[in-house]
């Protein structure tokens, strides 16, 4: 009946629409078989082909739909035809969709989705809601996702962006920079407080109510994985009433008070959205309680929440609460980045408050402002601003101490930031209470802090207080001995300046008392992993022993002897250091020198004997040099020659076996023998010993050995004659590397020439020529040429040139082993011995095997 009424103005009588026999035939057939859909479709197609009017075709479609009112395919065909007209009547299409959905109960999925799609295309919010409701009612639950997805997409992509573009004061608060934001919040807060009559734009609407209702409905059926995303989208609608009511469905409630609490199951952002809705709705008590709960649940968001709460206080005109919050936060922050953010916001807040109040005071609006009260507020904000700037370093130091209160350097920095002595004392006192000595990382730093604390009183002439402090400091269980060293040494220096040396001695002697079993205590301390106090091993402090000995030596009389108290204390201190194996090379030298200066030379020798074995070979060498120098000094030493020889031999045995270059000792030993016994041969033999030591490795201390060979041969030439000199030359040349032996070959040849042995000299040069290729042996060939020009003739000169040419063409570049080849030509025997004092050396070169190919020249 309703369909008939609706089409009353459209449908005319049959006579107006039936024009020809074909129409009559179709009418007859549909009257005969009205349920034959095919006949109806052919009838409509015929009219469309005939070009009947829209009004006529619509009349026939209405009859068709009335006959098959529950068939959605016919309604779809009708709607499709209406949609293809040149002028589409959207309202008529919506009307058809609604009639169809009202009539049909099954197979409505395509109709529903098409209806919804058209509504979304037309941005018709009312139709979208109707299409959504109809679709959800007609379609199976499993298909609802296909209904919701385009609607939610439309809300997110088309509707909400328009909501965000709506310019309100809320947008202004979110988009401006921080200084402008604070100013906006100040205006808002002062206006709400009734202090100013500033007009602010208030958004009277509830935001995007249409979207919020859609999303509220969607959240009831949304899948779990879409819930959080949808809640976040809901917050964008700014319909705070709906936001609050919907969010509360997902928040837990306090059993006693019934207040809603943050949910740990929801992300932080969603909890904060609820918090923001409470603020927008002016629910201050609920806002502050919820904020307090969020601070407990989200400690990692502490900074963000603090600044949000600060802005909230400003927007409510509660400037004192904001200042207190920021000040408290500065004293709690643990990270420099958080400190920097809060400090800058606090500074900006005080600056903007001062400028804002100053501007209003200049307007002189007595209706709203009490000049006196607000002048005082202005002064308070300006004072806070100035204080923030002045105390920046202190606040920064606070952060460092909160991070690690056991960092002594930070406390010392804090002391330096204080101006008065009283303030410095307070910092020292606080540091001593808060620092755990077992957690101090830098050895000696805590002890230096105690020293500085006491020095503060000492410089103020409060001597007894300083002493009490240092006495107390010695009871602290330091894990590092360096802390006690700092205190004792500093205290001793102060007492030395104030009371004299006896008081300083007493302080250090108290530290250096050696227990009965020091080794056991040292072992326990070493294995204690910083759990055993350093006081147990303080006696092992080299720094304190050094300072103590320095004091003793400085105040020991120059003419002191064994009857002098300080002299005996000095000796005892040195000996204790040796017993504890703390002695250093410098201390050993100083001890020996100290005894020598006080005429106890023999006792100084005992110092060398005891200390030398304590050091590595390199240090032993230096001490042996000093020891032997004093031992061989006839002004100081009374040792017998046999004892001195024993010392030389002992030194050489210990040092040479460890690869130490003992050239200096060999030379000193040689000089000593020549001076004491007058035996030149023995002196030369000592030099030879030094030169041949280490022949297993020809490069060992090579330069020192070369120098010893030069001294040895030079002395032999001048004192022992040709026979011994030849033996030394021969041994030297055979031991040394070829490149170094050439020097001695030339000297050997010159020596033979000087005593008239020219043939031997020529053979020696010929031998040396074979040691190296001519290109690397220029010095020898130059000498060879000079020799032939002076002592040879034309034939010998030619022979020399011929030899050089042969060697240049045949000799291998590497001839390092030529002197050691089997059958190598040895030196020719001398015709006569011209040395009346030709002695055989203690270790003769005859130990070498005789070469059967040795050339003997019968001169």
From Swiss-Prot:
Organism domain of life: Eukaryota
Annotated compartments: Nucleus
Gene3D superfamilies: Tetratricopeptide repeat domain (1.25.40.10)
GO BP of this protein: generation of catalytic spliceosome for first transesterification step; mRNA splicing, via spliceosome
Keywords: mRNA processing, mRNA splicing, Nucleus, Repeat, Spliceosome
Gene: SYF1
Function summary: Involved in pre-mRNA splicing and cell cycle control. As a component of the NTC complex (or PRP19-associated complex), associates to the spliceosome to mediate conformational rearrangement or to stabilize the structure of the spliceosome after U4 snRNA dissociation, which leads to spliceosome maturation.
Note: Present with 2170 molecules/cell in log phase SD medium.
GO CC aspect terms: cytosol; nucleus; post-mRNA release spliceosomal complex; Prp19 complex; U2-type catalytic step 1 spliceosome; U2-type catalytic step 2 spliceosome; U2-type post-mRNA release spliceosomal complex; U2-type prespliceosome
Protein family: Belongs to the crooked-neck family.
Keyword match Isomerase: no
Protein name as annotated: Pre-mRNA-splicing factor SYF1
Database matches in InterPro entries: HAT, HAT_Syf1-like_N, HAT_Syf1_central, HAT_Syf1_CNRKL1_C, Syf1-like, TPR-like_helical_dom_sf
SMART domains: HAT
Keyword Signal: no
Primary location group: nucleus
Assembly: Belongs to the NTC complex (or PRP19-associated complex), composed of at least CEF1, CLF1, ISY1, NTC20, SNT309, SYF1, SYF2, and PRP19.
Spans of repeat HAT: 17-49, 52-84, 88-108, 123-157, 177-219, 238-271, 427-459, 461-482, 520-554, 599-633, 639-675, 685-718, 720-754, 756-790
């Amino acid at each position: 009946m309703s369909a008939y009424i609706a089409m009353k103005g459209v449908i005319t009588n049959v006579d107006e629409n039936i024009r020809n026999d074909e129409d009559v035939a179709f009418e007859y057939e549909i009257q005969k078989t009205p349920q034959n859909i095919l006949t109806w479709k052919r009838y409509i197609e015929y009219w469309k082909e005939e070009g009947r009017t829209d009004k006529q075709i619509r009349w026939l479609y209405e009859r068709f739909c009335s006959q098959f009112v529950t068939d959605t395919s016919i309604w779809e065909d009708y709607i499709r035809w209406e949609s293809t007209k040149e002028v589409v009547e959207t309202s008529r299409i919506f009307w058809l969709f609604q009639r169809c959905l009202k009539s049909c109960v099954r197979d409505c999925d395509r109709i529903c989705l098409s209806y919804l799609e058209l509504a979304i295309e037309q941005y018709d919010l009312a139709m979208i809601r109707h299409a959504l409701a109809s679709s959800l009612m007609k379609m199976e639950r499993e298909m609802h996702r296909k209904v919701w997805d385009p609607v939610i997409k439309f809300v997110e992509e088309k509707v909400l962006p328009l909501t965000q573009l709506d310019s309100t004061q809320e947008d202004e608060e979110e988009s401006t920079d921080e200084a402008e934001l604070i100013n906006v919040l100040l205006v808002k807060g002062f206006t709400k407080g009734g202090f100013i009559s500033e007009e602010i734009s208030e958004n009277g609407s509830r935001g995007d109510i249409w979207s919020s209702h859609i999303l509220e409905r969607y959240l009831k059926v949304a899948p779990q994985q879409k819930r959080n995303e949808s809640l976040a989208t809901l917050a964008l609608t700014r319909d705070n009433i709906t936001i609050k009511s919907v969010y509360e469905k997902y928040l837990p409630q306090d059993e006693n008070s019934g207040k809603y609490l943050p949910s740990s199951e929801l992300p932080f952002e969603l909890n904060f959205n609820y918090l923001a809705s409470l603020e927008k709705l002016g629910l201050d008590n609920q806002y502050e309680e919820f904020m307090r709960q969020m601070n407990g649940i989200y400690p990692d968001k502490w900074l963000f929440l603090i600044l949000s709460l600060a802005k909230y206080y400003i927007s409510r005109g509660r400037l004192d609460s904001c200042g207190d919050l920021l000040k408290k936060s500065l004293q709690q922050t643990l990270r420099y980045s958080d400190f920097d953010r809060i400090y800058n916001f606090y500074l900006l807040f005080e600056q903007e408050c001062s400028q804002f109040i100053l501007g209003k005071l200049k307007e002189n609006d007595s209706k709203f402002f009490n000049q006196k009260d607000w002048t005082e507020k202005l002064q308070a904000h300006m004072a806070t601003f100035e204080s923030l700037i002045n105390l920046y370093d202190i606040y920064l130091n606070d952060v460092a101490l909160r991070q690690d209160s056991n960092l002594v350097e930070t406390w010392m920095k804090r002391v330096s930031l204080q101006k008065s002595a009283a303030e410095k004392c307070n910092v020292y006192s606080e540091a001593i209470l808060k620092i755990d000595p077992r957690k101090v990382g830098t050895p000696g730093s805590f002890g230096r802090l105690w020293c500085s604390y006491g020095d503060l009183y000492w410089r103020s002439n409060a001597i007894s207080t300083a002493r009490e402090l240092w006495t107390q400091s010695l009871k602290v269980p330091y894990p590092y001995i360096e802390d006690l060293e700092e205190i004792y040494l500093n205290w001793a220096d102060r007492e030395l300046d104030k009371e004299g040396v006896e008081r300083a001695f007493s302080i250090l002697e108290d530290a250096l008392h050696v227990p009965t079993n020091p080794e056991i205590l040292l072992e326990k301390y070493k294995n204690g992993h910083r759990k055993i106090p350093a006081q147990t091993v303080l006696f092992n402090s080299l720094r304190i022993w050094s300072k103590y000995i320095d004091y003793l030596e400085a105040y020991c009389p120059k003419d002191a002897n064994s009857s002098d108290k300080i002299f005996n204390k000095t000796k005892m201190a040195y000996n204790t250091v040796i017993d504890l194996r703390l002695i250093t090379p410098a201390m050993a030298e100083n001890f020996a020198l100290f005894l020598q200066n006080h005429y106890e030379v023999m006792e100084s020798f005992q110092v060398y004997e005891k200390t030398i074995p304590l050091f590595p070979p390199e240090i032993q060498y230096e001490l042996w040099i000093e020891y032997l120098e004093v031992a061989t000094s006839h002004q100081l030493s009374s040792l017998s020659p046999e004892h001195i020889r024993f010392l030389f031999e002992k030194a050489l045995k210990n040092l040479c076996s460890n690869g130490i270059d003992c050239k200096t000792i060999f030379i000193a030993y040689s000089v000593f023998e020549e001076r004491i016994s007058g035996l030149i041969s023995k002196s030369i033999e000592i030099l030879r010993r030094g030169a041949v030591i280490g022949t297993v490795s020809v490069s060992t201390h090579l330069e020192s050995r070369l120098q010893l060979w030069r001294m040895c041969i030079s002395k032999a030439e001048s004192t022992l004659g040709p026979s011994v000199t030849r033996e030394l030359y021969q041994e030297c040349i055979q031991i040394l590397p070829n490149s170094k032996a050439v020097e001695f070959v030339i000297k050997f040849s010159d020596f033979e020439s000087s005593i008239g042995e020219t043939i031997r000299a020529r053979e020696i040069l010929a031998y040396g020529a074979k040691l190296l290729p001519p290109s690397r042996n220029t010095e020898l060939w130059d000498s060879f040429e000079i020799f032939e020009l002076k002592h040879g003739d034309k034939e010998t000169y030619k022979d020399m040139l011929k030899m050089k040419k042969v060697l240049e063409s045949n000799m291998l570049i590497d001839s390092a082993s030529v002197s050691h080849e089997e059958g190598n030509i040895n030196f020719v025997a001398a015709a006569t011995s011209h040395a009346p004092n030709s002695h055989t050396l203690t270790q003769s070169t005859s130990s070498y095997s005789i070469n059967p190919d040795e050339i003997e020249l019968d001169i």
